[in-house]
């Protein structure tokens, strides 16, 4: 740090006397900065530096701005020497380029772990900050040394010793960590002394440290003892023993019994004291809120067993009542009053009320790519506003939902005056790019097709650090080729108005049934719907292959509000699409009316609108809260030009509740979440298409379907039967986050049903429809036995933006007559993690 400060001071002092001596003194003042360049780079990518300093391009040069840029250069800690220079970029000296000639610090050529035998080198490398290819930094090396030591202590190696050194070699620096592990220490026994009110077995359950057993490692952690002592104290304090304490923890180490491990016996000495009851609370000095309002925050009844934890929670809720309304500088003090004879504990709370606090500054630290305005616009608090705790919490939720940051640490500090506060946001950015490419199987089972296709997708959710989204998606295969482009501006004209555009080109080779000659609305050679529905597949000779070309352009917009109870979003968009099918019309006629009509260039336009209420804590991986959304889509905007006219409604609801959230370590909680979802979709046709379908001349495309992937997991083999006009879909998931924000183990129960509104019968059921009213009634009664397609099973759900996949095994079943009828085989399901917004 001393070297860094000295270098910065020297550069600042020389700026006016040497580095900036050009044609005229101070010619660069007030001139726009056209570029910032770095000379002397060897290992550091220029693009990385361009991203960091691009925000300064176009700004006018000032001495303060120059110092800010120079400070950021030194903060990178990439360079041992920095020489600044101002260079004109035009003969008239109207633009200035800041040129930094630098000498890079050496890069890390390699990292070695020496002496470790019990913990793999790969595990140790994952615990350190320095990586191969990074610029060497001695401070980071020392931090990594301490990180490794803490990791060993967490694994029970209490006597571990770690040293580090940097060896300069050709091409960089090799960092070496030398480790003396020692023997692992495990807890063989835990015992208590002095406990009378509670048994030893009860108190053991309070501790995070456990005895070594068959399914419990029992690793001894020195730093866990203080937390365990506090846990015992809290357990007693919740039950009226307000003076209870753990006087000490004796450790008896056995080094002889087990040659590979040290066995330790922990003995907790407890002083319990007397049990007290709650004697009530007196509040003085309050004027803004009534005494009754404040007393209601403490949910303890006079005469009940004293619960210190509940009282502290109530006292905090009382303080939050002021804090929520902007009174952050109030003084609150509580005094205990004991009646040792009656064994009661009462309190007196003194409130000194002051003026409301206002936000003076919002300070952002740690950003390199993201512009400050992208963060500030998500804040519901602005400089000059009355501070509100709920708005502050909701602002943090908005920032977390952006998924731009791997770490976000907020802080509220006093401002320049008593009634002013500064909000400080310490952030650490993460990658917002999503790049996917690979090979997928397509056309499997089709004669004469090449069963592979290539795909590539690039998506950037924080384009140029401005919070906008851009995406490119391309697919190349023998049966399908597509190109999709998308752009979304999340805050249009500085308001929470979203504006986006999409463009798509697609070519596909598809199959359709040939039209029959029976005039009964069935494909050749089938004579009844029962025969068609029960057929496992169609013979190759009865299928018509055709090519389909689509071109589409769409636009969408949305607006959102932030009331206290939820985030409200209203969205809408239009989609303009032209399609054309290619097939031999002289010798073949398709059974599908849509395919037949689209032999000529056909326009398909649609309009959609949606509204949602989002009360989830985090939109992308919720643990609590709820969501309610409604979307309506109108296909066919021009009555006489377009032939496809339909309306679709989608209603969705979600609910999440946390069942368990137990801190196992400083970085991981054992967490269980229960998630519920229900959805109803309805699609109806109107106009010409509705009348033509009623004549039995064909079938319509785009019906609702149980696809077996996103809807009705595991039912993909029956997708052609499971289509209709009404779709009901429900699921329940038990979620266990294995790595928070990355991957979760889920166990799901899924139920879905499609229904044909016109025929008044469920699709995919075993019963047949009948033309007579009595037969139809009987059919509907029989069909109702197997309406829902159900499934259950385990799976892994990835919540990373770069890897939004679900991997699951599903066992499908129905319930005819209320009796579950399961299948023996399990189906593997690969789907995407789709979050409703």
Curated annotation (Swiss-Prot):
Q: Which keywords annotate this record?
A: Cell outer membrane, Membrane, Repeat, Signal, Transmembrane, Transmembrane beta strand
Q: What is known of its domains?
A: The N-terminus (residues 22-369) partitions into an aqueous phase and is predicted to be periplasmic, while the C-terminus (residues 426-837) partitions into Triton X-114 and has the hallmarks of a beta-stranded protein, suggesting it is membraneous.
Tell me the name of the encoding gene. tp92
- Which protein is depicted? Putative outer membrane protein assembly factor TP_0326
Free-text biotechnology note from the record:
Recognized by sera from 42/43 syphilis patients, it shows promise as a diagnostic antigen. In further diagnostic tests for syphilis this protein exhibits a sensitivity of 86% and a specificity of 99%. A fusion with TP0453 (residues 32-287 of TP0453 fused N-terminally to residues 38-450 of TP0326) exhibits a sensitivity of 98% and a specificity of 99%, and exhibits superior accuracy in classifying analytical false-positive samples than a commericially available test, making it a better candiate for diagnosis.
Instruction: List the GO terms this entry assigns under cellular component, sorted alphabetically.
Output: cell outer membrane
Share any extra remarks: The outer membrane of T.pallidum has no lipopolysaccharides, few proteins and is a fluid and very fragile bilayer. Its lack of surface antigenicity is thought to contribute to the ability of the pathogen to evade the human immune system.
Q: What does this protein do?
A: Might be part of the outer membrane protein assembly complex, which is involved in assembly and insertion of beta-barrel proteins into the outer membrane. Both rabbit immune serum and rabbit antiserum specific for extracytoplasmic loop L4 promote bacteria internalization by rabbit peritoneal macrophages. Pools of human syphilitic sera from the USA and Columbia recognize both the N-terminal POTRA-containing and C-terminal beta-barrel domains as well as loop L4, showing this protein stimulates the immune system in both humans and rabbits.
Domain (POTRA): give its ranges. Answer: 31-105, 106-182, 185-273, 276-354, 357-430
One GO biological process term:
membrane assembly
What is the residue range of the signal peptide feature? 1-21
Predominant location: membrane
Oligomeric state and interaction partners are given as:
Part of 2 complexes of about 239 and 164 kDa.
Bias class Low complexity marks the residues at: 765-784
Q: Where does the UniProt annotation locate this protein?
A: Cell outer membrane
Transmembrane keyword on record:
yes
Chain intervals for the UniProt region annotation (Disordered)? 761-785
Induction text? Transcribed at low levels, estimated to be present at about 100 molecules per cell (at protein level).
Q: Which organism is it from?
A: Treponema pallidum (strain Nichols)
* InterPro entries, per the entry: Bac_surfAg_D15, BamA/TamA_POTRA, D15-like, OM_assembly_BamA, POTRA
Residues assigned to the Periplasmic compartment are 22-433, 462-468, 490-499, 544-554, 616-623, 659-667, 737-741, 800-802, 830-837
Q: Read off the PANTHER family from this record.
A: SORTING AND ASSEMBLY MACHINERY COMPONENT 50 HOMOLOG, SORTING AND ASSEMBLY MACHINERY SAMM50 PROTEIN FAMILY MEMBER
Please, which domain of life does this record's source organism belong to?
Answer: Bacteria
